[in-house]
């Protein structure tokens, strides 16, 4: 994929929000990026793998799952093209992938070095704010999910809460 085409695609990604394709192209030139292809149902990462790169789904979709010790699996969430993976875990003390990541369809993921990314966000306030917003939104989503599961014990309570929350949005 050409940098120009990738830059246009990345205008829709939260980390590059508000930047034009030309500015994104200049960023990409500094990032030493790689695009990897994955087949449907391929495991991209396992829970516990070290997270050393910024990762963005640029084509396709994937889901995160956790496996209990007894073998049961829980789907944590689906991610689609344009989403940044595990951004809130990238610079933490324990920067490991929090879930197994499995593709739902043939997919392409963009990888770039987190230290080089850090260099470019130091130089552009908008990029820094975009990253902070990305990890804040992920943290808020996680908090919301924990609260939802904490306050709604039964299936009935969870369904009613979901309906109430989504009814108010329409």
Residue ranges, per PLM feature:
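Cyclic nucleotide-binding regulatory module and flanking cytosolic helices
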Residues: 1-40, 85, 89-92
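Short phosphate-coordinating micro-motif centered on Lys-Gly-acidic
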Residues: 43-49
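Cyclic-nucleotide recognition modules
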Residues: 31, 75-133
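Short, small/polar residue-rich loop motifs at catalytic or cofactor-binding pockets
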Residues: 30-31, 49-51
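Glycine- and acidic-residue-biased ligand/ion/polar-headgroup-sensing regions
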Residues: 41, 52-65, 70, 81-82
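Polybasic "coupling" helices that flank or enter modular domains
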Residues: 104, 126-170
